[in-house]
Amino acid sequence: MMKLHKLPSVSHRLASAVRRVGLIICLFALAGCADKEVRLSGDREDVLSDLRTLMIDGQASVELAGLGNAVVNSAFGHPGVTSAHDGGHLSLDLPLKQLWKARIEETESDVVMLAQPAIVNGKVFALGSDALVSVFDLETGKVLATEQIDDAQAGLFPGVAGGLAANEKVLIAHAGRKMLTAIDSNSNQILWSVEHSEPLAGGPTLIGNEGVVVTDIDGSTLAFRLNDGALVWQTTGLPADTIVLGSGSPTVHNGTVIVAGIGGEVSANAVADGKLILGRQSGKTGTAHTT
């Protein structure tokens, strides 16, 4: 026999639904009051209170950190402007505006950094990783000349960019390989090239109008005559335990050539004959080899 069940009234169902909703609200309210994180015992410090806003020291700003007056520079013969790499405080007409751009052919910037360009006689001299020197007009960016200064297919040492140095008469360049080349900065023609036994690394740095100094991958320092490329003197290199892929770009100041090895060793040699003034070279304190 089938039994009939009496259905709850509408009011009863409504009251039941209200109770369920109320229960859910209570559960959420209790959850909101609960502690959400585990607190460890011990003292606490307010780290945000130690934050400081960068402020400019007014007195130091007025002093300009000893830079002196800004000077207008029309030539850029070395990294750092001068052979001592102490170009000083250069004047700029801000904001800077792009006048032109050009591409150096066959660069391999993923393999080697590029050398810093040099600017003399209204020209920009730039060096690509393919050992090609490109000459651009400073005002228009037009290519005026190109010169191959070494074997484009020769191997490169990662991080060795080669280098450029120039004055009103000559540009000296090497591409991180074995050749050192002089180019007439007026006619853009090669004057001379000399080949070293090891790849060159730092420099070139001009010694006035008389010479040029570079370093090689073994940390030796070499000085050449500027007019014909003849080797004047060569050091025996910084200590082997301080050298990693050569030395930095030499600095020439007050008759002294100063070189810093990548390993941290610093040496100073007399410009005239390479005589050691400061530091140590191959563990010796004698004079450099001269020719």
Could you describe each region identified by the protein language model?
Residues 42-56, 63-99:
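Blade/loop signatures of beta-propeller domains
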Residues 137-141, 184-188, 225-229, 271-273:
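Short loop/turn segments that connect beta-strands within beta-propeller blades
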Residues 34-36:
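Bacterial signal peptide processing site
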Residues 73-74, 121-122, 168-169, 209-210, ...:
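Short coil/turn segments that connect the beta-strands within blades of beta-propeller domains
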Residues 29-32:
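C-terminal motif of bacterial Sec signal peptides marking the signal peptidase cleavage site
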Residues 128-129, 159, 175-176, 216-217, ...:
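Structural signature of WD-repeat beta-propellers
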Residues 99-118, 146-165, 191-209, 231-253, ...:
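Extracytoplasmic beta-rich repeat domains
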